[in-house]
């Protein structure tokens, strides 16, 4: 099973942790985005959208990290796997957290941080305030249960761990958020592959403007 990825990418790391939790060995293929590796013809044949992560499982190509995470559990996980249980309400809550992470939390971070290294712009305090609103939302969600979507580790925790560790790696302090801090300490100890996730997150430091 080929996995095209970049360690500093939070979406890639969320898939790596999912595979680790399921005991799946991935054939990791480092794709050097900053050198245009994603635009090479051989990769475009696999993924014309030229994004990572991309998984190829016996000829079946799939991209978008949350889609890959769900696919891996549904194909290789246990029946009613706790990572993504079969109960519609439990799945719905996990999905809500996954979409929140992708479309609100990490997007808020990207809006604030990416212009600083892509366009060499100074940090925008207003964009940071908007990002803090998304952290407030996450803090509220995490006040309701032990983990992100209930009392056991799920795909939601793995995706959110990849994001929050990225924030920490680029010196964004989440310790002032009581429930995020409690949850973050917990998942760093309980999420399979958390150490590899942190090592990848630290590569984000290379993007911090000097």
Curated annotation (Swiss-Prot):
Query: What's the catalysed reaction?
Result: RX + glutathione = an S-substituted glutathione + a halide anion + H(+)
> According to the UniProt entry, what is the EC number of this protein?
2.5.1.18
Its name, as the record gives it, is Glutathione S-transferase 4
* Record-stated family: Belongs to the GST superfamily. Theta family.
Q: Which UniProt keywords apply?
A: Transferase
Q: Which SUPFAM superfamilies match?
A: GST C-terminal domain-like, Thioredoxin-like
Q: Which GO terms describe its molecular function?
A: glutathione transferase activity
Q: What does this protein do?
A: Conjugation of reduced glutathione to a wide number of exogenous and endogenous hydrophobic electrophiles.
Q: How does it assemble?
A: Homodimer.
Top-level EC class, please?
transferase
The residues covered by the GST N-terminal domain are 1-80
Binding positions for glutathione per the UniProt entry? 9, 50-52, 64-66
Q: Which residues form the GST C-terminal domain?
A: 87-208
State the Gene Ontology BP annotations. Answer: glutathione metabolic process
InterPro entries from the xrefs?
Glutathione-S-Trfase_C-like, Glutathione-S-Trfase_C_sf, Glutathione_S-Trfase, Glutathione_S-Trfase_N, GST_C, Thioredoxin-like_sf
What gene, per UniProt, encodes this protein?
Gst4
């Amino acid at each position: 099973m080929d996995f095209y990825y970049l360690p500093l990418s939070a979406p890639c790391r969320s898939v790596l942790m999912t595979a680790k939790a399921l005991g799946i060995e991935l054939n990791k293929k480092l794709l050097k985005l900053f050198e245009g590796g994603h635009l090479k013809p051989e990769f475009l044949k696999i993924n014309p959208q030229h994004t990572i992560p991309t998984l190829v499982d016996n000829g079946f190509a799939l991209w978008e990290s949350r889609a890959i995470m769900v696919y891996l559990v549904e194909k290789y996980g246990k029946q009613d796997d706790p990572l993504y249980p079969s109960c519609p309400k439990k799945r719905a809550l996990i999905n809500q957290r996954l979409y929140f992470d992708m479309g609100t939390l990490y997007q808020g971070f990207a809006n604030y941080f990416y212009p600083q290294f892509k366009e060499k712009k100074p940090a925008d305090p207003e964009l940071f305030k908007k990002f803090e609103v998304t952290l407030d939302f996450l803090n509220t969600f995490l006040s309701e249960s032990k983990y992100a979507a209930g009392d056991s580790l799920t795909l939601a925790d793995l995706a959110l761990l990849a994001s929050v560790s990225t924030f920490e790696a680029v010196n964004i302090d989440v310790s002032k958020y009581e429930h995020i801090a409690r949850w973050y300490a917990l998942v760093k100890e309980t999420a399979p592959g958390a150490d590899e996730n942190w090592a990848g997150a630290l590569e984000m430091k290379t993007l911090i403007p000097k």
